[in-house]
Amino acid sequence: MIWHVQNENFILDSTRIFMKAFHLLLFHGSFIFPECILIFGLILLLMIDSTSDQKDRPWFYFISSTSLVMSITALLFRWKEEPIISFSGNFQTNNFNEIFQFLILLCSTLCIPLSVEYIECTEMAITEFLLFVLTATLGGMFLCGANDLITIFVAPECFSLCSYLLSGYTKRDVRSNEATTKYLLMGGASSSILVHGFSWLYGSSGGEIELQEIVNGLINTQMYNSPGISIALISITVGIGFKLSPAPFHQWTPDVYEGSPTPVVAFLSVTSKVAASASATRIFDIPFYFSSNEWHLLLEILAILSMILGNLIAITQTSMKRMLAYSSIGQIGYVIIGIIVGDSNDGYASMITYMLFYISMNLGTFARIVSFGLRTGTDNIRDYAGLYTKDPFLALSSALCLLSLGGLPPLAGFFGKLHLFWCGWQAGLYFLVSIGLLTSVVSIYYYLKIIKLLMTGRNQEITPHVRNYRRSPLRSNNSIEWSMTVCVIASTIPGISMNPILAIAQDTLF
């Protein structure tokens, strides 16, 4: 009898929850229509996986890619609409958030073709991989539009949990298991510190959780200059620092980059930074409006440490993925300059433009690593010597992406850095910009060193890996080359047409 009563209560509670969720989607679903498309794609993937066999693998890629492209299309159709706050203040839709959501969707769309051949060669479970990628993308999109402390915590946890699972996807690889363990432990620790900072904000504002209401609460309680706000600022900076991975919060980055499957690293290297940058700008700009001098100083220290340590340590690396890990630490230092400048002097517009270029440069380089690694099984920089003699397209595309990452004209990376540094200079960040210029010169050195190896034709320097190198006959090879071609074009052509891209970003934001 008791069991029947409990069972009926469970059914009633479940029905109420379902009806409430349906009610929210019915009246607020139009505000998260791009996210709803991804949710529908996830459900469709699960249904097809449970009713089909392994011969339907192409359908999994098709559904994932189509849902991402449709989500991008839905996002573009509502471009330039009036800002809307929905879900009882938990979610905000505006042009600023939508730009970051577009960048995250673009990352995921380009990463799926990179993964096709890798998944087939390593015989990884395809459905779960794509589910984790789409769910992480969904978490990143919700983080971009999060408008209260609870959503800002839950959304990145959704992204992080999928990231942990993806980084340890090759369970038989010892390095992958080690990377996942470090990633999980440090991620859990950083999340607890982030929540600790949120608790101080919540208490100091008189129990408010919405970002703008927190500012009003701090004014009402006269706590905006209290020690509690300083504790909250430091704790939240540490928590967000783990997601952005600037120095000194970068310890997990090289190990995770080296141990995780290469397509996963490509995905995490861009999406995590885009989502964390969107969250950082909103948190620092709104609740900490009265502490702008303090958080500017904290971010300046992080940017300087990142640019110096990231680029100097990258010189000493022998693994291509570890080198790119330290390079990404240096790159996030440049992005932080845009966060510090903010609305004034086009700081956000230049930051978003540079991140768009960084996505293409970084993913183009990782496409090369995926392709070369599948043919040779190595990640050592020395083993790339003489690749031009065997695969000119791969070597030339790699060289263009690396030169763009280094910031050499007339490539996209040069104009992106130039405008970012110019905005910082106009804002009075002279020391920070000077460090950025010097470390950019340092980065050119180790990028050129790799390009020299790629282009060498001396037989004594060519390794057995390149001598035995052969192109794969797999049809899916075209997907990697397609992604690489798109990324190479995006890393070169926008450099010539920088002004229109920047004008679009400025017009959209302001």
UniProtKB/Swiss-Prot annotation:
The chain crosses the membrane at residues 24-44, 59-79, 99-119, 124-144, 149-169, 183-203, 229-249, 295-315, 323-343, 347-367, 395-415, 418-438. It comes from the Eukaryota. Keywords: Chloroplast, Membrane, NAD, NADP, Plastid, Plastoquinone, Quinone, Thylakoid, Translocase, Transmembrane, Transmembrane helix, Transport. Its EC number is 7.1.1.-. It is a multi-pass membrane protein. One of its GO terms (biological process) is photosynthesis, light reaction. It catalyses: a plastoquinone + NADH + (n+1) H(+)(in) = a plastoquinol + NAD(+) + n H(+)(out); a plastoquinone + NADPH + (n+1) H(+)(in) = a plastoquinol + NADP(+) + n H(+)(out). It holds the Pfam family Ndh2_N. InterPro entries: NADH-Q_OxRdtase_suN/2, ND/Mrp_TM, Ndh2_N. Its main location: plastid. GO terms for cellular component: chloroplast thylakoid membrane. GO terms for molecular function: NADH dehydrogenase (ubiquinone) activity; quinone binding. It is found in: Plastid, Chloroplast thylakoid membrane. Belongs to the complex I subunit 2 family. NCBIfam families: NDH_I_N, PRK02504.1. HAMAP family: NDH1_NuoN_1. NDH shuttles electrons from NAD(P)H:plastoquinone, via FMN and iron-sulfur (Fe-S) centers, to quinones in the photosynthetic chain and possibly in a chloroplast respiratory chain. The immediate electron acceptor for the enzyme in this species is believed to be plastoquinone. Couples the redox reaction to proton translocation, and thus conserves the redox energy in a proton gradient. This is NAD(P)H-quinone oxidoreductase subunit 2, chloroplastic. It comes from Yucca glauca (Soapweed yucca). The gene is ndhB.
